[in-house]
Regions:
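P-loop/Walker-type NTP enzyme "switch/lid" segment
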Residues: 1-32, 143
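A generic structural signal for short coil/turn motifs at secondary-structure boundaries
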Residues: 17-20, 105-106, 151
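C-terminal boundary of histidine-terminating zinc-finger modules
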Residues: 142-158
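Conserved catalytic-core segment of NTP-binding enzymes
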Residues: 22-131, 140
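C-terminal alpha-helix
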Residues: 160-170
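Residue-level preference for the first positions of well-ordered beta-strands
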Residues: 8, 40-42, 147-148
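Gly/Ser/Thr-rich helix-start
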Residues: 13, 49, 146
Length: 170
């Protein structure tokens, strides 16, 4: 899909068992060929670690992991960060984004298992970049089959993301 301001390449996946080798080779090839024509390339991968071990993600400047504010989700993000390091993907920086928070009260305070997990991640080089608040407008876009590009500029989720992109100088 080509549009004003961005182009979109979607990689489908087959359902059920089977080898993804050919699909991953195609994806790698497209990315290597097309990436040079863009100032920024954003890869939105399915949750999980498979795309890293399949090495479809190379030459990463910034690795962002989005997780809900639970110990389990944050540990998974930490594991992904660890695998990226073991596979020598060498992202310039790695950051965690907490998603769908209802407010500051959703972030457990010091002394909780969640806070301890965040401290471990920070020590391992995975810093907390920011939080995306729960945003009813995002939910409504999904229910009305609209894209997030149709959100109003003052949508809380968009404002939070814009602040994080500023922190990253993007």
């Amino acid at each position: 899909v080509e549009s004003t301001g961005f182009d979109l390449l979607v990689m489908g996946r087959t359902e059920g068992p089977g080898c993804y080798c050919h699909a991953n080779d195609l994806l790698r090839g497209f990315l290597e060929k097309l990436a040079g024509g863009y100032s920024h390339v954003v890869m939105d991968n399915e949750a999980g670690m498979e795309h890293l071990s399949r090495r479809t993600t190379r030459d990463v400047d910034v690795l962002l992991m989005v997780a809900n504010a639970t110990v389990t989700a944050v540990r998974s993000a930490g594991r992904i960060h660890e695998i990226a390091q073991k596979l020598k993907l060498s992202p310039g920086s790695s950051h965690l984004i907490l998603n769908r928070l209802n407010g500051p009260a959703d972030l457990p305070g010091a002394g909780t298992a969640f806070a301890a997990e965040l401290e471990k991640l920070e020590a391992a080089g995975l810093s907390l970049l920011g939080e995306v608040p729960y945003d009813e407008q995002v939910v409504m876009c999904g229910m009305e089959a609209k894209g997030v590009d149709e959100l109003p500029e003052d949508a809380p989720a968009l404002r939070a993301i814009a602040e994080m992109m500023e922190k990253l100088n993007l």
